[in-house]
Regions:
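Short coil turns that delineate tetratricopeptide repeat
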Residues: 54-57, 91, 125
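Short, conserved micro-motifs composed of acidic
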Residues: 76, 99, 106-452, 456-475
Length: 476
């Protein structure tokens, strides 16, 4: 009996040691992944370590870090759940309450969000972020109840269950779209430790060509074709897409010059993403080259956007000298030296102490961009700003609902000289999965008119007459 008891105790001791070792190993993996910004991988490792841990203080910290990972990868519903659990476990830093409110706002739960922000204000009254967030929730509620004339439609045939984002017109008549995708079939077959999806490629879709019907009947509406890879579309060896991330495309109006982002792996480590350019010759895209900007290689250079006249390159960077985490910068092209000049910050009217991304310069000189620092509905909202007479950009204006939602909305572009039709990216509720591309349309104004048609001479009403009204643009 004594021998059996000793064996049993030894087995239990071994199991406890093995469990502690496994938990410690997972925790170390999670910490390493978190430091490398591999949030999807870190969250999985934290989950495993959490399930094996018996240390309450350690579990509380891991619960908070799991919430942080979910927030960083845009999984707001999961982040909300983890923040709630962390607060219930009596996490001692009230920042968890602020972040819970942010996740509730991102999910459109504005009343719950306001309660969380009010609770945070009681604990940290000197932090103005909660008060600003309450104001934003009130604005958002009003915007949802009073939508603008824009209508937004999910491009279901273009999107996949993976991330699809950042559409860019690639020819003069706006019948081709380049966009970023993480769908099956991309060049790289590995899963990104940061996002949990495939590494992204640049793919293409175009409006199908339809023969017009004779007569005055309703013409069929052309549809966007099934997206295919860049190499397959142009039928050439793809020199643009690699096994790692490419995306955030910007093209010249003629569609023969392309700027895009590329992530480069060196010695098993990703280096800060840079902007590359390539030109199209004889229908084929040439070997891309990194463009030279005066930005230290330790900092990111992303979301490039070429101005319509090709003299300015707008981009986003976390380099020093800005106002927040990521700012919008611009570089002017110098013809004499055939090079881009030193980056110039877009200033405090545009940039905040948070993040600004996806700049887009319209033909009329309006700058469109996304921000989570200006007052918005939640996540990233799309804003616009017009250049003043002094050359600086003026007060930014929120594009409101339904262009914006409580989720992340960014990457807007417009076709033609107006701002009536275009595309944007959003991970809003109701999409196919992750980021989706949406079509944007400005609805026509509708008027209700009534009156009586009378004879000029007699003043008597005229019966049985149909009236046709024609506008200055020929519309009737």
């Amino acid at each position: 009996m004594r021998y059996t008891r000793i064996v049993f105790l030894c087995c239990v001791s071994c199991l406890i040691s093995l469990n502690s070792y496994a938990q410690g190993k997972q925790l170390k993996k999670a910490e390493t992944a978190y430091e490398r910004l591999e949030f999807h991988k870190a969250m999985k490792c934290y989950k495993r370590a959490y399930s094996k841990s018996n240390d309450r203080a350690q579990k509380i910290q891991m619960s908070f870090l799991m919430a942080e990972c979910a927030r960083r990868i845009g999984n707001y519903r999961q982040a909300e759940s983890y923040y709630k659990r962390t607060i219930k476990m009596r996490y001692d830093d009230p920042i968890a309450i602020l972040y819970l409110g942010m996740m509730q706002r991102n999910l459109g739960k504005y009343e719950d969000a306001i309660k969380s922000f009010e609770l945070y204000m009681q604990k940290v009254p000197e932090d103005i972020r909660a008060q600003e967030a309450i104001v934003a929730c009130e604005f958002a509620t009003d915007w949802v109840n009073n939508p603008t004339r824009y209508a937004v439609f999910n491009m279901k045939g273009m999107n996949s269950k993976f991330d699809d984002r950042m559409a860019s017109f690639s020819n003069k008549d706006n019948t081709q779209l380049f966009f970023t995708t993480a769908r099956k079939g991309v060049t790289g077959r590995k899963i990104s430790a940061q996002t949990g999806q495939y590494y992204t490629d640049i793919w293409v879709t175009e409006l199908e060509k339809i023969k017009k019907k004779k007569g005055k009947g309703k013409q069929p509406k052309p549809k966007w074709t099934e997206p295919i890879s860049l190499g397959e579309f142009f039928d050439f060896d793809d020199l643009v897409n690699t096994k790692y991330d490419e995306g955030a495309v910007s093209l010249s109006e003629r569609g023969d010059l392309m700027y895009f982002n590329r992530a480069v792996m060196k010695k098993n480590e990703f280096h800060s993403p840079r902007i590359y350019s390539t030109i199209k010759k004889a229908g084929e895209w040439q070997t891309p080259e990194e463009i030279s900007l005066s930005v230290d290689s330790n900092y990111m250079v992303i979301y490039s956007s070429l101005s319509p006249d090709q003299t300015k390159l707008y981009f986003v960077s976390d380099m020093p000298g800005g106002y927040g985490n990521f700012d919008i910068w611009v570089s002017n092209y110098d013809k004499k030296s055939d090079a881009w000049g030193d980056p110039i910050n877009m200033g405090p009217e545009v940039n905040t102490d948070a993040m600004e991304i996806s700049p887009y310069m319209h033909k009329d000189g309006t700058l469109f961009f996304a921000s989570n620092g200006h007052i918005g509905m939640g996540g990233f909202d799309i804003f616009r700003s017009v250049m003043r007479s002094d050359g600086q950009y003026g007060k930014v204006k929120n594009m409101k609902y339904p262009i914006n939602s409580s989720y992340d909305d960014f990457g807007i572009i417009f076709s033609g000289k107006d701002v009536m039709n275009g595309f944007l990216t959003s991970n809003r509720k109701g999409g196919r999965g992750g980021d989706d591309i949406y079509e944007v349309k400005l609805s026509d104004l509708k008027f209700a008119m009534e009156g009586v048609l009378v004879d000029d001479e007699t003043g008597q009403p005229i019966q049985g007459v149909s009236i046709n009204l024609e506008g200055s643009d020929g519309a009737s």
